[in-house]
Amino acid sequence: MASAHIEHKLSLLPDLPGCYLMKNLNSQIIYVGKAKNLKNRVRSYFKSSHTGKTARLVSEIADFEFIVTSTDKEAFLLEITLIQKHQPYFNIKLKKGTGYPYIKITNERDPQILIVSDVRKDGGYYFGPYPNVYAAQETVNFIQKVYPLRRCHGFQKRPCLYYHMGQCLGACFKTVPVAEYDAQIKRIKSFLNGHVETVKKQLTKRMDQAAADLEFERAAELRDQLNYIEMTVEKQKIISNDNTPRDLFNFYLDKGWLSIQVFFIRQARLMKREKRLFPVVSTAPEEMTSFILQFYNRKNNVLPREVLVPNGLDKQVLSDILGIPVRTPQRGQKKDLLDMAQKNARIVLEEKFRLLELDERKTTGAMQEITDALGIPAGHKIEAFDHSHIQGADLVSAMVVFTDGQPNKKLYRKYKLRTVDHADEAASTREVIRRRYTRLLKEHAALPDLILMDGGEIQLEAAKDVLENELGIATPVAAMVKNDHHKTADLLASAGDQHLHLDPKSQGFYLLQRIQDEVHRFAITFHRQVHTKHSLSSRLDEIPGVGPKTRNKLLRKFGSMSKIAGASLEEIQSLGIAKNVAQTVKFSLAGGGVTPKHYQKGAT
């Protein structure tokens, strides 16, 4: 079942094509996919049952984001770029491959046209990448027939087979003029950049003639050639027609918030996207100009050869300061990319507003529900306490702080109890409450609006007694009560009181659960640390010849009994520990029990 966070993000998905990026709990991208309809595709992961690898993927998804494109093909091309960049774990098939192919015209005296898997800085002309590998290969075959270059291995004193077939200019047996190659390359570049109408008309005419002559196989071949040209030479927004490194900025402004999208186009591909959201004071053009200048002032941002921005920005100022052309495209491929960036900026901002509304209900709204239920003034800050021990040993307390419904971990505190040496909930509560709020009074620090105790009447009454009768503090206190399954059940305002019966489906109840789970987790974690350290110290203290200084040296260096036991005699002695003591430590931790005679001091 999807988390509440995922559910709300699913409701924000648009009915548009694009790519989605699935993330795990560590915010690592674990899967990249594409969709004709983002809303339907992404929702299908969480609304349908799955098996095998898909089930494993869904179980690890903690969050996702998406990028909107204009067509399904753009999503295809963007998908491979994102996979190559992030190498997601679950994209195994695409990860192991070399990606979609490119069509390349080589930079040689006698150039060739080839299918290649990557782009190199070798002076060649690259076109692509192309999602349909077979269509790209067939298009190259077509070009080799219509616009031949060199198709053989080079000079071999006699014409090759391809020359006789009209698919090679003859570098195999003669010197082909550079001008002839240049003219042919110009035609190929024009063809691959989309100027295909003349060729398509010729093919269509030949296809119709073949059909009229009842040469149906030949007509089918010509029809397929037309389809391959459509698939490979079709205009693309994600892929530009040149390899100029450029960055593209666009924005969307609403309700005092500015949403910015930055597209990084490298090697004719959208290599990276950054998105930013912040409230603004000045006008959008002023904020954008300032943002762009600060953006390139960062250490890791390298200037491209060109920057594209929307209308309204002072391009001359930007260009003068950055030292590169800053332009606003008015039509064509670059303008379409700029529009796509603005569309994504708008979608991100709309999502932000919906999440803000949701967060307000979850945080400040939830806080309001709790204070209303207790009948106390609305507040912002809650401090919650819990104790932890094992059969009365290593007693500790912990405090967590929630501000406007959000954990404020910088204010968390840990307490080793000093006056309690056995399991006594009331005494533990008195000590930690006394220590915490005596200090706040002494420092003239702000008191919380509500104090919550994890427990029941015992903890509640002990806390109230210290606050009211010893410290004169009137801060409201309540106890977070658990049910028989050790789950959050309700709030208790005073001893003998009826439970408040918060609605289990309310945001206030969910906040109470989060606070109780967090303070319990924090206390348990601290107790384990203390108990582990004490266990190590106690066992070392039992070894003859090991005093506090030696014990501390060993713990600081090795950290655990297993590592001390696994250390060599020389490693232990390197800490300034005498050889006979080091031998005793080694023997004792190896399970030897009483130190043998030959390990006693003075033995040889």
From Swiss-Prot:
Q: Which Gene3D superfamilies match?
A: 5' to 3' exonuclease, C-terminal subdomain, GIY-YIG endonuclease, UVR domain, UvrC, RNAse H endonuclease domain
An example molecular function term from Gene Ontology annotations: excinuclease ABC activity
Residue ranges occupied by any GIY-YIG domain in the UniProt entry: 15-92
Annotated Gene Ontology cellular component terms:
cytoplasm; excinuclease repair complex
Domain named UVR: residues = 197-232
Share what the entry says about its subunit structure, partners included. Answer: Interacts with UvrB in an incision complex.
List the HAMAP family hit by this protein, alphabetically: UvrC (MF_00203)
The UniProt function text for this chain reads: The UvrABC repair system catalyzes the recognition and processing of DNA lesions. UvrC both incises the 5' and 3' sides of the lesion. The N-terminal half is responsible for the 3' incision and the C-terminal half is responsible for the 5' incision.
Return the PANTHER family for the record.
Answer: UVRABC SYSTEM PROTEIN C, UVRC/OXIDOREDUCTASE
Q: What name goes with this protein? A: UvrABC system protein C
Q: Which organism is it from?
A: Lactiplantibacillus plantarum (strain ATCC BAA-793 / NCIMB 8826 / WCFS1)
